[in-house]
Regions:
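N-terminal beta-loop-helix "entrance" segment that forms/cooperates
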Residues: 82-100
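Glycine-rich phosphate/pyrophosphate-binding loop and the adjoining helix
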Residues: 24, 179-193
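Short, small-residue-biased leader/transition segments that mark boundaries at the very start
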Residues: 1-5
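N-terminal export signals
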Residues: 14-35
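Helix-loop-strand module that forms the ligand-binding subsite of alpha/beta enzymes
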Residues: 103-185
Length: 193
C-alpha cells in the first residue's frame, strides 16, 4: 500500500508541476503582462508574496514560473517568502494609525517599501484548512499599518493557489477572501489560478 501511495503521490506531484507551467502561462496571458511591455509603457513593479513552507512544493514552483514569465516580459519582480521571514500578526494596537510605522520590529519593514511602490501584488499560497497559510495571512494582516497608502491605490493583484482536492467548491472560501480583500482595497483583479 505504501508503494501505491508513493506512486500516486509522485504522479499527482508531476501532474501538478506540469499543470503549474500551463497555469502560469495562462495567468500571465490573462494578466496581460507580455502585452504591457509591448505597449511601450514602463514595466511594472510586481511583489510576489509566497506562503508555502515547502521550498520544493507545488506552490513555490508555480510562483517561480510566474516570476520567470514576468521577468522575461520585462517586469521588475520582488519575491517575499512569508515563511522564510519573521512577520508577526497585527495586534490591532493602532499605533500606526493605519498610515504610519508599525511598532513591531520584524521583517515586514523589509517588505513595506516594496508594497508601497508595487503596481501589482501576487498572492501565492497553498490551501491550509480552507484558508491562506498562516504566514501569508500574518503579512496580509500587517497591511493595516499601510492601509492609508494602499487602499484606493491603482494597484493590480493576482491569486495563485495550490490545493489537493478535485472539487472547485473547496477553493471558494479562499477565492472569496481574495475578492473581498481586493474589493476593500480597490485593487483590480488580473487573474486567479
Amino acid at each position: 500500500l505504501g508503494d501505491v501511495y508513493k506512486r500516486q503521490n509522485m504522479d499527482r506531484r508531476k501532474f501538478i508541476k506540469t499543470a503549474g507551467l500551463a497555469a502560469g502561462a495562462t495567468l500571465l496571458s490573462g494578466i496581460g503582462l507580455a502585452e504591457v511591455t509591448t505597449e511601450k509603457t514602463k514595466s511594472m513593479k510586481i511583489v510576489v508574496l509566497t506562503g508555502s513552507p515547502r521550498l520544493n512544493g507545488n506552490t513555490n514552483h508555480m510562483a517561480s514560473q510566474f516570476i520567470k514569465g514576468a521577468e522575461e516580459a520585462g517586469h521588475d519582480v520582488y519575491r517575499f517568502d512569508c515563511t522564510r521571514h519573521k512577520v508577526a500578526g497585527c495586534i490591532g494596537c493602532n499605533a500606526c494609525g493605519m498610515n504610519g510605522d508599525c511598532f513591531m520590529q520584524d521583517d515586514f519593514s523589509e517588505l513595506r517599501p516594496h508594497l508601497l511602490e508595487a503596481d501589482m501584488v501576487v498572492f501565492v499560497t497553498p490551501m491550509y484548512y480552507f484558508g491562506f497559510s498562516s504566514q501569508l495571512k500574518a503579512v496580509i494582516d500587517r497591511f493595516y499599518a499601510i492601509n492609508g497608502r494602499i487602499k484606493g491605490a491603482a494597484k493590480q493583484a493576482a491569486f495563485i493557489m495550490a490545493y489537493a482536492d478535485t472539487d472547485p467548491k473547496e477553493a471558494e472560501p479562499m477565492v472569496s477572501h481574495y475578492k473581498t480583500l481586493l474589493n476593500y482595497l480597490g485593487w483590480k483583479d488580473r487573474g486567479m489560478v
